[in-house]
Regions:
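RNA-binding basic/glycine-rich loop and surface signature characteristic of RAMP-family CRISPR effectors
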Residues: 1-189
Length: 189
């Protein structure tokens, strides 16, 4: 990591923070202003397995025999939360950075646009984490209100729980969804 990289020139440094280290000096750090929670499966694991062998690797070593391996296969909808501290986007006191309101807004819009392409590579497979349901707003309190509040039961999204959370927030909240994903789509709308 180049210690000369600043939030002014690198949006990823601005949004996701950094730890700049130099030999014989204290580290300079910036906490992430955009935070993505862990992705949690909304559907149970059903025990699907893919059976593999290591034949290719074993063939490269004389005397080594191939082994069978099991890999879990899980297709599910996932819930994750993105929170962004809008007061800190484009502002970095460590490096004296203070971007214009227009540039700060652009960074947030760019981040939100990137989320539609979110995926996760794990154990040789790619998980599509592009949103099929989004809920949120601009809130005074910097709290991940919907973290662990998205629940799915037999294809139905728990709308009653979401309504309760929205009532407690008492600030405008918007949601959107892709057609054909949830059984209770009309209720969600």
């Amino acid at each position: 990591f180049n210690p000369e990289a600043t939030a002014k020139d690198y949006p990823e440094v601005d949004l996701f923070g950094y730890l700049k280290t130099k030999k014989s000096e204290n580290a300079c750090k910036r906490a992430a202003v955009a935070r993505l929670s862990n992705a949690i499966s909304l559907e149970p694991y059903t025990g699907d397995m893919d059976f593999l062998t290591n034949m290719r690797l074993a063939s490269q070593v004389k005397g080594l025999q191939n082994n069978i391996a099991n890999v879990e296969i899980h297709h599910s909808l996932y819930s994750y939360t993105l929170t962004v501290d809008l007061d800190l986007v484009g502002i970095d006191e460590n490096d004296g950075v203070s971007l214009s309101g227009k540039e700060r807004a652009k960074r947030v819009v760019d981040l939100l646009n990137c989320i539609q392409h979110l995926y996760h590579d794990i154990k040789g497979r790619r998980e599509n984490l592009a949103p099929v349901f989004v809920i949120g707003g601009l809130y005074e309190a910097k709290s991940p209100y919907f973290l662990n509040r998205i629940k799915l039961h037999k294809g139905d999204l728990n709308v009653a729980l979401l309504k309760e959370v929205i009532e407690n927030i008492e600030e405008p909240t918007l949601c959107g969804l892709l057609t054909g994903i949830f059984k209770n789509e009309d209720e969600i709308r």
